[in-house]
Regions:
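Core beta-strand elements of the Rossmann-like FAD/NAD(P) dinucleotide-binding domain
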Residues: 3, 196-205
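Short hydrophobic core segments
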Residues: 8, 201-211
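Glycine-rich FAD pyrophosphate-binding loop
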Residues: 22-42
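Dinucleotide-binding Rossmann-like beta1-alpha1 core, especially the glycine-rich loop
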Residues: 45-130
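Helix-loop-beta segment of a Rossmann-like dinucleotide-binding subdomain
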Residues: 87-89, 128-165, 187-189, 201, ...
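A conserved short coil-to-beta-strand element within the FAD-binding core of flavoproteins
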Residues: 171-186
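Flavin (primarily FAD) binding-site architecture
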Residues: 208-222
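C-terminal catalytic lobe of FAD-dependent flavoproteins
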Residues: 226-233, 240-241, 247-266, 273-416
Length: 416
């Protein structure tokens, strides 16, 4: 069988394209060398946030992220959950306080697009009622809403929905070579990493959704994907420290999140250029990076110095290349690269850049390009309206609590 499209990479972008393409009637093969969402997707801060910090230098990314985060919430209510945040304000910085409130006022319209509440300004007493451990020099706080997500299930359910629409899934299968007819890419050769079997799959279009590995995959065809990979680490604590997140400030001014997530708390992230092997980035977490994050937490909550980290982990962002820009200020915009026009290699597309909150839009745009390259007429995407598996009919938890002797909130947590 010759597939319409073979996709290399089962992170959220690859799985999203597989779902969109399959739902628009294309035959799809999806390859992932590990398990769904095992790379950059799984190493994220696990929020479909609106890109608040990008508002300073990349307003279009904030807009599209906020709009598509609302769609992700709509199609995956069982995977997403509200995280109310506090942004501590410190003594001696009155102008900074006013600037931050003006900044959140500008962000409010984007927050509302994804279902968040308007920000509020709290006194020190009000802030300490919510988080009693705040440092003595905290004179107040600002509030805002973001949304957490189970990233591994999000990637897996996109792949599952693609399969229900007819896609073939190949987890734990590494693409080791591209197949050619002349200069045209015509498929992939893959190796099953569980049993060692090597097999070939032909396709009319091959999509490189390899994330930070995209440059290496494109190089198999003599093509080029220019990225500026960024390393980000997180520290996880073994308990849920509170029900509110905190927006922290690193010693270099970088925004850092302390995020309650299930029974754990996540602290992150850093942002540094990285040109090593993305598969080994977990082995390159340094004591200085961990200390940097812990110091940011201790600035807001002195007791954080006594918290016991459970683990530290890292990932690599596949950010688009920019020269002369600090890693923290790199754009999170995305591009679909057509290597026929860029490198004279027909049959190969690459996905570059992007962020978790706008994966669905990225997949829609990529599928539009695939349809055009295949000579098919345009077909509308339904991925922003069709619920992911398991989200079709959320139960009435209040009514269910009358039958099961548990609080509605507990039942909702079990359902999620």
């Amino acid at each position: 069988m010759v597939f319409d499209v073979a996709i290399i990479g089962g992170g959220i972008n690859g799985a999203g394209v597989a779902r969109d393409a399959a739902l628009r009637g294309l035959s799809v093969a999806l390859f992932e060398r590990e398990d769904w969402g095992a790379g950059t997707t799984g190493a994220s801060t696990r929020m479909v946030h609106g890109g608040m910090r990008y508002l300073l230098y990349d307003v279009p990314t904030t807009r599209t992220s906020s709009e598509d985060a609302a769609r992700v919430r709509r199609i995956a209510p069982h995977l997403t959950f509200r995280i109310p945040f506090l942004w501590p304000l410190y003594a001696g910085r009155p102008l900074f306080h006013e600037a931050m409130e003006a900044f959140l006022s500008a962000y409010d319209p984007y927050a509302r697009r994804k279902g968040g509440l308007r920000h509020a300004r709290l006194t020190a007493e009000q802030a300490r009622r919510i988080e009693p451990g705040l440092a003595p020099d905290v004179t107040g706080a600002l509030t805002l809403d973001e949304w957490g997500v189970d990233v591994h299930r999000l990637a897996a359910l996109n792949a599952l929905d693609a399969r229900e629409a007819g896609a073939r899934l190949f987890p734990h299968c590494e693409v080791v070579e591209l197949l050619f007819s002349g200069r045209t890419v015509r498929g992939v050769r893959a190796r099953d990493r569980l049993d060692g079997r090597v097999f070939e799959v032909e396709a009319r279009i091959v999509v490189n959704a390899g994330g930070p590995w995209a440059g290496r995959i494109a190089a198999m065809a003599g093509a080029r994907v220019q990225l500026r990979p960024g390393k980000g680490i997180h520290v996880t604590f073994e308990r849920r420290i509170g029900n509110h997140g905190l927006i922290l400030e690193g010693v270099d001014g970088r925004t850092i999140f302390l995020v309650p997530h299930g029974a754990e708390t996540i602290l992150g992230t850093t942002d540094d250029d990285f040109y090593g092997d993305p598969a080994r980035v977990d082995y390159e977490v340094t004591r200085d990076e961990i200390a940097y994050l812990l110091e940011a937490a201790a600035r807001a909550i002195p007791q954080a110095r006594t918290w016991r980290p459970l683990r530290a982990w890292a990932g690599v962002r596949n950010t688009l290349f920019e020269w002369g820009v600090h890693a923290d200020a790199l754009s999170r915009r995305h591009e679909v690269l057509d290597h026929e026009t860029r490198d004279g290699v027909p049959g190969l597309l690459s996905l570059a850049g992007g962020k978790l909150a706008s994966y669905r839009l990225f997949a829609e745009e990529a599928t539009d390009v695939i349809l055009e390259k295949l000579g098919h007429p345009p077909r509308p995407s339904i991925t922003g309206e069709r619920p992911l598996p398991g989200a079709e009919a959320p139960p009435d938890f209040v009514r269910l609590a009358r039958e099961i002797p548990l609080p509605p909130a507990t039942l909702e947590r079990i359902w999620r």
